[in-house]
């Protein structure tokens, strides 16, 4: 299974006073460089989601895609942009893994863990969890669900996947958290 690594850098960084969090320095290296270093060995291709002028990321030599739904905001807009990009590449990339660019210490085996959790649970979607908290920004997303996600965002105005406030039932039961694994499941007969 080929996976595209989606680096989410589309936010406005309000809590950090604005600017690009991904370009903030940590020990002489940008957060983005650190995340790329961790994720690149785990995926077959890398893609950066960022809004505004993409030339500010030129030195990273990555495709840069803006949010698919302009003005929507939030990480789901970036995930949808990644799903759209992967779909445009053809059937070679059936999954994307999304990661935040302000998390420079992501696990070296994140993609393997997400893939294993997804397969073991028979789920469509998987996301990371730690310390009893689910982190949906770090997720494994099948490209085939992109239109379901688009409809949920546009028609139902879903802006986040918030497992704390909305689990176990997200969007009328479309998602449910597997009891013993950090996995969200989507049943084929249900909407997004």
Q: Which residue stretches match the model-derived regions?
A:
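Nucleotide and nucleotide-moiety/phosphate-recognizing core
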Residues: 1-158, 166-179, 183
């Amino acid at each position: 299974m080929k996976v595209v690594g989606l680096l989410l850098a589309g936010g406005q960084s309000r809590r950090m006073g604005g600017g690009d969090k991904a370009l903030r320095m940590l020990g002489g290296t940008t957060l983005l460089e650190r995340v790329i270093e961790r994720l690149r060995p785990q995926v077959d291709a890398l893609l950066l989601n960022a809004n505004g002028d993409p030339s500010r990321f030129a030195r990273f030599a990555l495709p840069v895609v803006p949010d698919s739904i302009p003005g929507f905001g939030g990480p789901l807009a970036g995930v949808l942009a990644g799903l759209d990009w992967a779909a445009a590449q053809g059937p070679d990339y059936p999954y994307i893994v999304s990661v935040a660019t302000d998390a420079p210490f992501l696990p070296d085996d994140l993609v393997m863990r997400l893939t294993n959790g997804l397969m073991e649970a028979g789920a469509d979607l998987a996301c990371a969890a730690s310390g009893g908290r689910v982190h949906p920004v770090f997720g494994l997303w099948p490209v085939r669900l992109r239109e379901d996600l688009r409809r949920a965002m546009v028609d139902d105005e879903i802006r986040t996947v918030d497992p704390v406030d909305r689990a176990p039932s997200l969007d009328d039961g479309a998602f449910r958290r597997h009891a013993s694994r950090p996995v969200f499941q989507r049943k084929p007969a249900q909407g997004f």
